[in-house]
């Protein structure tokens, strides 16, 4: 019998550990490299904990170019830029712009969807091997917005419809019925009924990491 192939993974977050476990199942010898211990304060420690296989619409989308100026000018916007770094980032930025076409967006979205469509069954396979009682809730995931028009969400809704994503565009009344404690400043939303979220991402991560160490 040949030697077991050795594989190294950089990063002891949820992606690194999950990939390591599936590689172990395939018979590979896996080593995870990370400067910090698994479960330390990083991305998989304090994120929202969403299991979101619907999130197949990429950032490289045509409408993002019209949104960027407003984001940069807003003091509370989600985008900030160090202006002395502009010259260094220009080659990357020009390449990004070239990818913000409908054709490139759909190419990325279709490939992301194929991968994400396998995510929940893959997590379920791993969770069958650990005790996660009460750590994962299957209540769906709700996105809401306060625009009076759906136009700001038309693109992503249409892309997900084309990909066959299970989504439900809902009215303010339906939002209130689902989440009566949210202040009614919203004008619409999208509900993904099969979405899940982790109550404690760190605990799930550490349970998966312990499973990795035992194999």
Q: Can you say where each PLM-predicted feature lies in the sequence?
A:
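Accessory recognition modules or surfaces
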Residues: 2-10, 14-15, 39-53
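Glycine-rich active-site loop/strand segments that organize a redox cofactor
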Residues: 46-114
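A conserved beta-strand/loop element that lines the FAD pocket in flavoprotein oxidoreductases
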Residues: 212-215
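N-terminal Rossmann-like FAD-binding beta1-loop-alpha1 element of flavoenzymes
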Residues: 5-31
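Short beta-strand/turn micro-motifs composed of small residues
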Residues: 11, 34, 145-146
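Rossmann-like flavin
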Residues: 90-210
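Glycine-rich FAD pyrophosphate-binding loop
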Residues: 25-45
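Short, glycine/charged-enriched secondary-structure capping and boundary segments
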Residues: 23, 45-48, 65-66, 157-159, ...
